[in-house]
Amino acid sequence: MKRDWVKWLLAVAALALAGPVLAQTRLKWAHVYETGEAYHKWALWAADEIKKRTAGRYELQVFPASSLGKETDINQGLTLGTVDIIYTGQAFAARTYPPLAIGGAPFMFRDFGHWKKYSESAVLAELMEGYYKKGGNKPVAVTYYGVRHTTANKAINKPEDMVGLKLRVPDAPLYIMYPKTVGANATPIAFAEVYLALQNKTVDAQENPLPTIEAKKFHEVQSHINLTGHISEMLITIVSGQTWNKLSDADKQSFEAVLKEAAAKATDDIVASETKLVDEFSTKYKKTVVRSDRAAFAAVFQKAHLGPDATWDKALYDRVQAIK
């Protein structure tokens, strides 16, 4: 009897010790991109890597293609506690901290090199910290989303070619700057609804990076790929403040390291894909690829950068432009 009692006590003690090790927290990572895109591929990698580095204590479930809501919804979900991690564009994050929108303004960057240095700069780090202090959610990494181009059923060589065009834009204020400045009619439509809107001719055109145009199959319902190159875009990986604050310091380091590595890997994939797709839209998909007059477009936006729609001041603008 005594021996049985000792065995029981040992079993209870073993379970008590095993409890914390076996405890697992499931986290939701939401985004609006397709499963075939680099962002999703490396989010899945990050989920596996975080599970390994935390000895299975955290399991990330990745929800792609707007399955947990539109981009506006998942941004709100960070604060509501319905999602734990998201990818989002600067314009959406700027609803919380407006100066952050500067990196998503049309023709803000001279080229990819300028964007890359900005993405690694103290300027962006300060803006991310401002976002964190304002809303409590933690930006931990940035991924190159690509250069946004304009698809339509006609050639767009110069800004005047866009006058009166019904252009779908994401539902965030900054994206209105592009159509407004060139005389197009901005039509905000949720990402998941864009293909149908183009097919039904609810809108005439849309704008996105080449990898996204391919992944979302927008080329199926548009004849021209116009290389306007108007926005060099990034996605921000943001962890909900509620989730971030529960992590130990060691786990915070693990999460941040993995998410930054995933962002770097996705960036490499997007850069390679952009280069390849310029030719493939013509040769593989038989689309008309138009090399728009980017200099003419950029000239139109000089005043807009410090106009009434800018959510940043001249001092910040000058710092961004001074990055070499």
Question: What are the residue ranges of the model-derived segments?
Answer:
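Bacterial N-terminal signal peptides that target proteins for export
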Residues: 1-10
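N-terminal secretory/targeting leader peptides
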Residues: 24-114, 123, 130-324
